[in-house]
Design a protein with these regions (language model features):
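Domain-level signal for soluble alpha/beta catalytic cores
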Residues: 1-374
């Protein structure tokens, strides 16, 4: 994992805006599936080039090969699951803003609407996605072979984020066994990504605290167990080749039900991952002060979100620079990488997303001049 040794590096955390022709093929569903995947090599080559042109240093494939999103993509990569109707719990924030939440993404479903469907575990979980994973790795390797970049990452879901709603596990005796089975299966994906020479990003959003109305004690207990399970799944993988991404969901909502980083940072720092990517926009903008008191362990790198995925407002380069400089003065300039709160693709209009990335590159350049007195 590269450090900001001579300038503030820039990155993001996953999904990027898809080309229009890919979106059109995806909308056609199964009949166009083969054509969609046949178009991926060129689409990945183009998105790698776009990231380089805009000024991103640590890049990925835009997650175009992950049909279903950051977690549901595993429905074709894990055995033991069936797609079935599922009632989801109403979280604390939905109860606090009931009228606002009706019909919104991640909100309360309108009265009379059909239940959503989810991945329901009905049998033993095993990894069956090697062909899909090999395809994604090959596409990204080919794209960066002719377009050198500072570093390359590929994301994979955390074992506790496949389906965490009640009723998802109908096979294993306990939730602990269910999560361990997911971890054992996903460890094949983790290892393949790092064996390819990429940085592994583990997507581990913490919106369960809000969505499941957990108490802080309940959340910390569950998160501590997840860290233990993940560390087991990461056995043999260098911590310097792993980064974790935590956030509070991509919904454009009030986010009053979010945790604060200080409520679980002690547990997060126990993960065998040297990179920590976290949400630091709007409601979380003050959390940089946490590192006045929390000592960043040797080898760890922070990747705060300097771009928000929950608003169309394009952050000013000077604001981005300010966010980077103030944190760098606490933990060391080499230990800070500019990141995003979550994936911008699919949540923001492509024009807005790329404008934000351009602003990030400009802000990182301003921060570099300040921190290196250049």
């Amino acid at each position: 994992m590269k450090r900001s040794s001579d300038h503030i590096l820039t990155s993001h955390v996953g999904r990027l805006p898809s080309p229009k022709h890919l979106e059109e093929l995806l909308a056609l569903g199964e009949p166009a599936r083969a054509e969609y995947f046949a178009a991926l090599p060129e689409a990945v080559r183009e998105i790698v080039g776009r990231q380089r042109e805009i000024g991103l240093d640590v890049i990925n494939d835009g997650e175009f090969g992950k049909v279903g999103g950051f977690s549901n993509y595993v429905r074709t990569r894990l055995s033991g699951y069936e797609q079935r109707p599922q009632q989801t719990l109403i979280g604390r924030e939905q109860r606090d803003f009931p009228e606002y939440s009706i019909g919104r993404v991640g909100g309360i479903r309108p009265a009379g609407s059909a239940p959503s469907s989810g991945m329901i575990c009905t049998g033993p979980i095993e990894y069956i996605g090697q062909a899909e994973l090999d395809r994604d790795i090959a596409n990204l390797k080919a794209a960066v072979a002719s377009q050198p970049v500072a570093d390359v990452f590929m994301a994979a879901v955390s074992p506790d984020n496949v389906n965490y709603q009640p009723g998802a596990n109908q096979y294993y005796k306990t939730e602990e066994e269910y999560i361990q089975a997911n971890a054992a299966a996903l460890s094949h994906e983790y290892r393949a990504i790092t064996d390819a020479g990429f940085v592994l990003q583990i997507d581990m959003p913490v919106m369960k605290y809000n969505a499941l109305s957990l108490s802080l004690e309940e959340f910390r207990g569950r998160f501590a167990r997840l860290i233990e399970v993940l560390n087991e799944a990461l056995t043999g993988i260098p911590a310097d080749q792993v980064r974790a991404h935590v956030c509070y969901g991509g919904m454009k909502i009030a986010h009053t039900g979010d945790l604060m980083l200080g409520q679980y940072i002690d547990l997060l720092l126990k993960l065998n991952a040297n990179g920590i990517s976290y949400d630091q926009n709007v409601r979380h903008d003050h959390e940089w002060t946490l590192f006045r008191d929390v000592k960043l362990p040797d080898g760890k790198v922070l990747m705060p979100g300097v771009l928000a995925h929950t608003t169309d407002v394009v952050e000013h380069p000077e604001l981005i620079a300010e966010r980077l400089v103030r944190l760098a003065k606490l933990v060391g300039r080499e230990n800070v990488i500019a990141g995003t709160d979550c994936g911008l693709g699919g949540r923001l209009h492509p024009e807005i997303a790329w404008a934000k990335f351009q602003s990030m590159a400009q802000g990182a350049a301003l921060a570099t001049r300040t921190l290196w007195n250049a």
